[in-house]
Structures are given as structure tokens and as C-alpha cells.
């Protein structure tokens, strides 16, 4: 028995050594043990063998302890989202200490107004700005801010600045200073700790593990089981009635008058920047305040709970006679089971209940879908609008009725198109595949026919020109020919080519009086060559084309009857489909100067003055956003085609215009740089590797709010920085010198809700033409989506 234990121990030791040697840990393992310890270990092993006493459990425990110690020593550095999560957990412990009987008190003085809390909040801001928190920056006086907050003398108005638009609108944007932004960040974390555990499950914002991706997944799953769908678009800027209602909701869980006074002072200074509708949320836009997401979710949480009452009234307390709570198939009981997540306990009667109501909310975008009659969907919509208007004092901009999920071309949700499709059966797929083959074969034959006739027609044109030239030679001219008879109408000195074109134009006007198509190919094929083709050949070609067209245009149901064993009794299977807005993306590419009006790639004049690496980073950032956002869409192949055919070519032509060389020569001179120009496959593989290597916190949309969905902005070089006109980086927390100053361009301002195109859809007009200084690292981070415009301190030059 001891011999078997020795064999097991030797095998484990060998596996342990093989694990440590490739990692370079074995030498360190031996070096960390003193010689006396090694000798003692050897003596102990010899004594155990002599006495027959052997502790396998002890040896295994020592091996595990040694391996764990080395794993801890060589652990990977934490990512910035992991650091941000640890900072928020540290603040969470301080907030939990203030909870008494379910209510939180003295949060401002005992939690927020503490230097360590403000420092942690500042570190969270710096992590969002991709700035290392190990570098201590003395620009923020945490002790003095904490003292002012505790004593109630913190002046909010003096810590704000306004930016006025230069256009006719004269729009004013009020933004907080860095000190006030730190205070707002601390308040945000504290309020999320208090309220986020109580948020409804239909809310996919301001919660860990929830976000835009989870909302689209929920909608995609439920639209296949629904009959009617609609969205509600909110529109309301924060006013007195909404703000007072918000404070009353917060007072249900927070007893802190000083915190309410501080929030009221921010509201009066117009620095909360809370607006329902107007622009998409979570896109890292500067006009979205730090407290916007938590305050909006606190306020709209009342609507989320009202939805459960609406759902219960229609699903569980409807006009159905089977509403007895004691019956095994009770709708009320099944409704409570569904809300509790007991999906496996549904009976057959419960599963056959037709009426279902689904709702999903991401910030101020609300989606509804109903499985049932249209009247119920209209009633639910009316009740939801009534509650939003009467109880929450919010306006609704979209007054459209519920649309059928099957008939509609799609519903715009979170910047994408969501629709309900029918999953085709294998027989229908086979029919469609055969029809597609027939259509392509007929198209190939038509192209070959047209190409052949056009080629013959061009030879006919050459023969006609030859005859005209021969008519000018006396020895070859035929006085009885038509050309000789009409030559009297030729002006003196007219060139032969000009005379031939006039003859062709006169002939075409006579032939094409009833034809709308006047292209060269059509004229040569239909009016010159085909009339001379043998009748049998022409009839055979058009007979084949008509038969192919009739086959392709025939209905699938008629074709299924020709197949053996048709399965017409099967129910259609529906599925949800998320579609990327390729038409809207194409319009944005034209607006940003990446393509022409006809869709061809072109150079961008605003990017020419940037460095080569910065130009490539700009295009790479657009490609990365498309791949991350639309990877699961059904038309992702169209996005890949845009990347390969237009984005890459626009990047090459921009670099060619920068160096003033032909685009065919750019690869020879910039071979290494052009190898980094992104393609769809390269970016897709890179993102997959990042998902495998990065921790789950880096993909948590709660932690990456404002970063993961931020759009690409357009910056042009304004000037280079010199010693006489120095400039530091405008990113909060960055102390690096900026080598250049850039001009921000607001290219578009979509109406809410807008399409998600990869670009910043709604930069305020007050920031259009604003100059900012950025270091090279943060310019790259802004382009590839590591930071957003919310990380830029626009008040650095006041």
C-alpha cells in the first residue's frame, strides 16, 4: 500500500515540476527554500520510509500550498474595469453601514463627504479616461471638497461653466468642473448601491450584467412569440415637477436632507443634464450628465412596477372565466409563477394561455410586444401612455398604433431593426434553392446573349463608319448608294466622324420614338442585331427566358405541391431577427466624406493632416465598433462588404491623398503601415481573442457604460503645439503634454430615437468647432473606443 502511495506522490511531483518549468517557476521554487528546510524535508522523507509512516494528504496539501503561492505571486495585473469594480465595492461597504431598518441616512456627511470616497470616485473617472490610478495627481483638493460638503458650503454654481453655440440657435450647454464631476461620481455610486438592487428585471440599464446586448437578446426572443409590437419614445427635459417627483421617490429609501439640498443646487445650476429623449443614452455624449443614468432609472422604476400591474390585469385578471385561484390551471397562479421564474412548473393548461405581455426598457427607450388580440395591445399602450403622462409628467412623441409583428418590415429598437421572420421548412428551403439556381442560370444566359449581340453591334458600327469613309473616296464611292444621295445635306468642312454621329442620331430618333431605354447596349442589341438573328434562334432564347421567369415568380405553395409528401399541416416556426441599419450607415458614410453619392470610396479631406497611424486608428475604430455591435445581426455579411469594399479603400485613398501618390503605389511605399489597415476577419478574430483573454468585468455594460456604445467622432488638426503656445491633454486625470490641438466637428444630430451607425449621432451644436488638446495615446483611445467624449474636460481653456 505504501509503495502505491509513493508512486502516486512521485507522479504528482513530476506533473507539478512539468507545470512549473515552462513558466520559469521551478528555479524560483527551489531558491525560495532555505537549505536547512530542504535538508529537513529529505530527512523527514527518509524517516517516514524507515518507519513506514507516510501522510499522502499532507504531501498533497503542501504541493497545493506551494503552487497557490506562486500563482498569486505571478498573477496578471487587473484590468481597469476590475479596478473600477473593486473601487465601487469599497464604496458599497461604506454605504451599507448607513442602512438602518431598510433606510439609508446621512449618506452625504458620512460617506460622500469623505476624502477617501472622493478619491475613489476620482479614480473611477480616471479609469474611464484610461489613465493609470497609480499616478497621483494633485489637481483635485479632496480634503477641502470634503470639508465644504460636510459644512454645506460647497458652491455648485462656481464649479460649472457654460458653452454657447456659435450658430443661430445659441444653445447653451452647462458642464461641471472636475471637482464637481468627482462629487457627482461619488453620488452616482452611492445611489446605485441604494436603488439598483430594487430595480425591475425589465430594466436593462444601470444593472450589472444588463445592457444593450441583453435588451436586444430579450426582444429577439420574445418578438417571435408576439403578435403586436410598439415602442414608446419619451421626450421631456428635467423641470420642477419632474425633479420634485424624483426627490419624493428618493426619499422613500434615503433620509438625507443635505443630499437633497445638494441635488437641488445642481438642478438650479442646470448641471444635472438629465433629459428624457432628445439623444440616445449610453453613447458617451458630453450632454449626458454623470447622474443621468441613475436618476433616470430611479424615476422610471415607478413605470417598471406599473407595468407589472398592467401585465397582471390583462394576463391574470382578464375576462376569462377560469380565474379561480384554487384551480390547478389558474391564470393568476401561472402569472405569479412566471414572475418568480418557475418556468419548469408550467402545466399544459398554463402553456396554452394565449395572452402574454412583454416589455423591455433601456434607459428612456421602451419596447412592448403582445401575444393576443390588437384591442389588448391598444389598451396596454393607452394605459402605459396614461401613466407616463399623468403620474410621471413625461411627454410621448410617437403616437403610432401597435403594428403586427409579421406584416411590419421591422421595428427600430436601440438603433437597430428588429423583425419577426418565418423559419422555412426543409422543403421550402429546397424549393427556394432550386428557384435561385434557375434564376442565376437564366441571368447568366441573358448576360451572354446581350454581350454577344453588343459585340456584333459594335462591329456593325465599325462597318458603317468604314462605308462612310469609302463614300468620300472617288474611286470607291457609289453614286447610286444612299450615302451619296444624302451627302448633299453635309456641311462643307464637316469631319467624317461628326457626319457619322449626325446620321446615327437621326436614325436613333426615328427608331427609338417609343423606347425609354436609349443606352448604347440596348440600341445595338435590340434594334440592330436581334432583327437580323435567325427567327428560330431568337424564339428559342425568349422561350427559355419566359419559362425561367415563370418558374421563378411562381408561388412556393404551388411548387410544394410538386414535391413528394408535402408537410402543409405543420405550423410555421417564427424567430426574431436583428438587422443592422445598412441604409442609414451608407448615408452617414456619405455625410462623413468616406464615399461618393454613387457609393464609391473616396478620401477624407479632414483626416489628411493627421499622422498615418492616426488615420488608420480612425478607420480601425469604425470597423471595431461595427464588428462588436453587429456581429450577431443577420445581415452581418453586408457590414463585412462595407468594410472590405468601402472603408478599407477609403483609408487607402486618404493615405494616397496625404502623400500625393497613386493608390496603386501606396502599398509599395507603406507596406508595413498598410498591413495594419483593418479587415472584417482580422478585427473579428482580434475581438474574439480579447473576449477569451479579458475578464468578464471588461464586458459588463454596467461598468463600461458610456464606453462600449460610444460612437466615432471626427477631429481635424487645428495646429501644432509650440513652446510659445503650450497645451496639456484635455482628458481628465492626464498630465501629458498634447503635441497638437484638434477641432471637433458635429457632423449630425439625429432625432430621438436614432440609428446606431458607428458615429457620434448627436454631438451638441455648442461643441461644434470646439478645440481640444489630446496626447497621442488618448487620441488613439478616442478613435478606437477606449474612451468617450465624456472623458474630455472642455473647460480646460476657459
From Swiss-Prot:
Summary of the function given for this chain in its UniProt record: Nuclear-encoded maturase required for splicing of group-II introns in mitochondria. Involved in NAD1 pre-mRNA processing and maturation of introns 1, 3 and 4. Necessary for mitochondrial biogenesis during early developmental stages. Essential for respiratory holocomplex I biogenesis in mitochondria.
UniProt organism field: Arabidopsis thaliana
Database matches in PANTHER family: COX1/OXI3 INTRON 1 PROTEIN-RELATED, NUCLEAR INTRON MATURASE 4, MITOCHONDRIAL
Pfam name, any one: Intron_maturas2
Stretch list, region Intron maturase type-2: 578-665
One GO cellular component term noted in the UniProt record for this chain: chloroplast
Entry protein name: Nuclear intron maturase 4, mitochondrial
UniProt keyword annotation of Nucleus present: no
Stored InterPro entries: Domain_X (IPR024937)
The EC number(s) this enzyme carries: 3.1.-.-
Molecular-function GO terms, alphabetical: DNA binding; endonuclease activity; RNA-directed DNA polymerase activity; zinc ion binding
Family statement drawn from the similarity comment of this UniProt entry: Belongs to the plant nuclear intron maturase (nMat) family.
Annotated CDD domains: RT_G2_intron (cd01651)
Zn finger limits (THAP-type): 729-778
Keywords for the protein's UniProt record, in alphabetical order: Chloroplast, DNA-binding, Endonuclease, Hydrolase, Intron homing, Metal-binding, Mitochondrion, Nuclease, Plastid, Transit peptide, Zinc, Zinc-finger
GO biological process: Group II intron splicing; homing of group II introns; mitochondrial mRNA processing; mitochondrial RNA modification; mitochondrion organization; regulation of polysaccharide biosynthetic process; seed germination; seedling development
Transit peptide: 1-16
Disruption phenotype: Altered mitochondrial morphology. Impaired seed germination (e.g. many dark and wrinkled seeds in siliques), seedling establishment and development (e.g. abnormal primary root elongation and vegetative growth). Defects in the processing and maturation of various mitochondrial NAD1 introns. Modified respiration phenotypes associated with complex I defects. Seed-specific deficiency in the regulation of carbohydrate metabolism. Small plants requiring sucrose-supplemented medium to survive.
Amino acid at each position: 500500500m505504501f509503495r502505491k502511495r509513493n508512486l502516486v506522490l512521485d507522479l504528482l511531483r513530476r506533473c507539478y515540476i512539468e507545470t512549473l518549468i515552462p513558466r520559469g517557476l521551478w528555479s524560483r521554487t527551489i531558491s525560495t527554500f532555505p537549505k536547512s528546510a530542504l535538508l529537513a524535508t529529505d530527512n523527514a522523507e527518509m524517516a517516514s520510509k524507515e518507519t513506514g509512516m507516510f501522510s499522502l494528504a499532507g504531501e498533497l496539501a503542501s504541493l497545493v500550498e506551494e503552487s497557490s503561492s506562486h500563482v498569486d505571486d505571478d498573477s496578471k495585473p487587473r484590468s481597469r474595469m476590475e479596478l473600477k469594480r473593486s473601487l465601487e465595492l469599497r464604496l458599497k461597504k461604506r454605504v451599507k453601514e448607513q442602512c438602518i431598518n431598510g433606510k439609508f441616512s446621512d449618506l452625504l456627511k458620512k460617506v460622500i463627504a469623505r476624502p477617501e470616497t472622493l478619491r475613489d470616485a476620482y479614480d473611477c473617472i480616471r479609469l474611464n479616461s484610461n489613465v493609470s490610478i497609480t499616478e497621483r495627481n494633485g489637481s483635485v483638493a479632496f480634503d477641502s471638497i470634503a470639508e465644504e460638503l460636510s459644512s454645506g458650503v460647497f458652491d455648485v454654481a462656481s464649479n460649472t461653466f457654460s458653452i454657447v453655440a456659435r450658430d443661430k440657435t445659441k444653445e447653451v450647454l452647462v458642464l461641471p468642473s472636475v471637482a464637481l464631476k468627482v462629487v457627482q461620481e461619488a453620488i452616482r455610486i452611492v445611489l446605485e448601491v441604494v436603488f439598483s438592487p430594487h430595480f425591475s428585471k425589465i430594466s436593462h440599464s444601470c444593472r450589472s450584467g444588463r445592457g444593450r446586448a441583453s435588451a436586444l437578446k430579450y426582444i429577439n426572443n420574445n418578438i417571435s412569440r408576439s403578435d403586436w409590437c410598439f415602442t414608446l419614445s419619451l421626450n421631456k427635459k428635467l423641470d420642477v415637477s419632474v425633479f420634485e417627483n424624483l426627490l419624493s421617490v428618493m426619499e422613500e429609501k434615503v433620509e438625507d436632507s443635505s443630499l437633497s439640498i445638494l441635488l437641488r443646487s445642481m438642478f438650479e445650476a442646470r448641471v444635472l443634464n438629465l433629459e428624457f429623449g432628445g439623444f440616445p443614452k449610453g453613447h458617451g455624449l458630453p450632454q449626458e450628465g454623470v447622474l443621468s443614468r441613475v436618476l433616470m432609472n430611479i424615476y422610471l422604476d415607478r413605470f417598471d412596477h406599473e407595468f407589472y400591474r398592467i401585465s397582471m390585469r390583462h394576463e391574470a385578471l382578464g375576462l376569462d372565466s377560469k380565474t379561480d385561484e384554487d384551480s390547478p390551471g389558474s391564470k393568476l397562479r401561472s402569472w405569479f409563477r412566471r414572475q418568480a421564474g418557475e418556468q419548469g412548473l408550467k402545466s399544459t393548461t398554463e402553456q396554452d394561455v394565449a395572452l402574454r405581455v412583454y416589455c423591455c426598457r433601456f434607459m428612456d427607450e421602451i419596447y412592448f410586444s403582445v401575444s393576443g388580440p390588437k384591442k389588448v395591445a391598444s389598451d396596454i399602450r393607452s394605459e402605459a401612455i396614461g401613466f407616463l403622462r399623468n403620474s410621471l409628467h413625461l411627454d410621448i412623441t410617437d403616437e403610432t398604433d401597435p403594428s403586427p409583428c409579421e406584416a411590419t418590415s421591422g421595428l427600430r429598437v436601440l438603433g437597430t431593426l428588429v423583425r419577426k421572420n418565418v423559419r422555412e421548412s426543409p422543403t421550402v428551403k429546397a424549393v427556394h434553392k432550386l428557384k435561385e439556381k434557375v434564376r442565376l442560370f437564366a441571368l447568366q444566359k441573358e448576360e451572354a446573349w446581350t454581350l454577344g449581340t453588343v459585340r456584333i453591334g459594335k462591329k456593325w458600327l465599325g462597318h458603317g463608319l468604314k462605308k462612310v469613309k469609302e463614300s468620300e473616296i472617288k474611286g470607291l464611292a457609289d453614286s447610286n448608294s444612299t450615302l451619296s444621295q444624302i451627302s448633299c445635306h453635309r456641311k462643307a468642312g464637316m469631319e467624317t466622324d461628326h457626319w457619322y454621329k449626325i446620321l446615327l442620331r437621326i436614325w436613333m430618333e426615328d427608331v427609338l420614338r417609343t423606347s425609354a431605354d436609349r443606352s448604347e447596349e440596348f440600341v445595338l442589341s435590340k434594334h440592330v442585331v436581334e432583327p437580323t438573328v435567325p427567327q428560330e434562334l431568337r424564339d428559342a432564347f425568349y422561350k427559355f427566358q419566359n419559362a425561367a421567369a415563370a418558374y421563378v415568380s411562381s408561388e412556393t405553395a404551388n411548387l410544394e405541391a410538386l414535391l413528394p409528401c408535402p408537410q402543409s399541416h405543420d405550423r410555421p416556426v417564427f424567430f426574431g431577427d436583428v438587422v443592422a441599419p445598412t441604409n442609414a450607415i451608407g448615408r452617414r458614410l456619405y455625410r462623413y466624406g468616406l464615399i461618393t453619392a454613387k457609393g464609391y470610396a473616396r478620401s477624407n479631406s479632414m483626416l489628411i493632416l493627421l499622422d498615418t497611424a492616426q488615420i488608420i486608428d480612425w478607420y480601425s475604430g469604425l470597423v471595431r465598433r461595427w464588428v462588436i455591435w453587429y456581429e450577431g445581426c443577420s445581415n452581418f455579411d453586408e457590414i463585412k462588404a462595407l468594410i472590405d469594399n468601402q472603408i478599407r479603400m477609403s483609408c487607402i485613398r486618404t493615405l494616397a491623398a496625404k502623400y500625393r501618390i497613386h493608390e496603386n503605389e501606396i502599398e509599395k511605399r507603406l507596406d508595413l503601415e498598410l498591413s495594419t489597415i483593418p479587415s472584417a476577419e482580422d478585427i473579428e478574430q482580434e475581438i474574439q481573442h480579447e473576449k477569451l483573454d479579458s475578464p468578464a468585468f471588461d464586458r459588463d455594460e454596467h461598468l463600461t457604460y458610456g464606453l462600449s456604445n460610444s460612437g466615432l467622432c471626427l477631429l481635424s488638426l487645428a495646429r501644432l503645439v509650440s513652446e510659445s503656445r503650450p497645451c496639456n491633454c484635455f482628458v481628465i486625470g492626464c498630465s501629458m503634454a498634447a503635441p497638437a490641438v484638434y477641432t471637433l466637428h458635429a457632423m449630425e444630430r439625429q432625432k430621438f430615437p436614432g440609428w446606431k451607425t458607428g458615429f457620434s449621432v448627436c454631438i451638441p451644436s455648442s461643441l461644434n468647432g470646439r478645440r481640444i488638446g489630446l496626447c497621442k495615446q488618448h487620441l488613439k483611445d478616442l478613435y478606437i473606443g477606449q474612451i468617450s467624449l465624456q472623458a474630455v474636460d472642455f473647460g480646460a481653456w476657459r
